[in-house]
Amino acid sequence: LLTLFYLVFSSKAWEYISLNLIQLKVFKRVSTYSIPLVPNNLAWWIINASDRTIVAHFLGTAANGIYSIANKFPNVFINFYDILNLSWTETVSLHYGDEDRDEFLTETMTSLFKMFSAACFGIVACMPFVFPIMINAKYAAAYDQILILMYAMLFRVLVGLYSCVYVAQKNAKKIAYTSMSAAIINIIVDLVLINKIQVFAASFSTLIAFLSMFIIRYIDVNKTVHMKIRKPIIIGTVLIGLMLVGTYYCENKTVQFVAFCITAIYA
């Protein structure tokens, strides 16, 4: 806040503001787009913060610490996505009116899906070998959560990639609607399962929330824009994902190494 005041007064920002130049039509159009983004941001805050809050309340700080450690690796994956998100949003907005829009978006989306899936699976496949080296043994329980959270973050990435169409359409209401729906699902699943499966409730609630949001946006976006992922890529991704689920928890290093090699070939 102090920084804001300093910038305003040092630059004399008020000299660049004139109420006479306000255009009500533009103001209304901008407000119509931006106001729904407030509940959207609130929904994202709920999704990100509710899990830790619920875990800390019902299971204590020790369990919350384990969950926080488990989120470290998915956060690295999300940071990778955040780097590309702005350029992808700009690309969709620029090419939204093109004649070959649908073909361009389908091909690009398929490539992005394969790239992020490969990155996600690569991290998961490395975990059996990397986790014991990087994380203290007293946080070993965090290992079981990482695969679930990584898959949740993969769906979060897909949600973000499809939401760019809403941005291009200036349809902030649907952005807010789908985000709030996911936030509600996240809290309900978390509260229902927290006393039954402990920390896993937070991981599964996040996965279910982002999976639900992805399905909703995928179906809705494709009503107006043909932006589907090629079926062979989907089938290959599902098979690799299921394979990693089977090998991640098996505690057999040989099997896990074979899974790592297969994942590397897929990537």
Model-predicted segments: where are they?
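Membrane-interface helix-loop junctions in multi-pass transport and translocation proteins
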Residues: 1-4, 173, 180-215, 242, ...
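Interhelical loop/hinge segments that connect adjacent transmembrane helices in multipass membrane
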Residues: 4-48, 87, 91-103, 224-235
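Alpha-helical transmembrane segments of multi-pass membrane transport and lipid-handling proteins
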Residues: 4-8, 106-156, 187-191, 195
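Alpha-helical transmembrane segments of polytopic membrane transporters and translocases
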Residues: 36, 51-53, 65-82, 110-114, ...
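Helix-loop junctions and terminal segments of transmembrane helices
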Residues: 70, 74-113, 163-168
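Membrane-interface junctions at transmembrane-helix termini in multi-pass inner-membrane proteins
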Residues: 150-181, 221-225
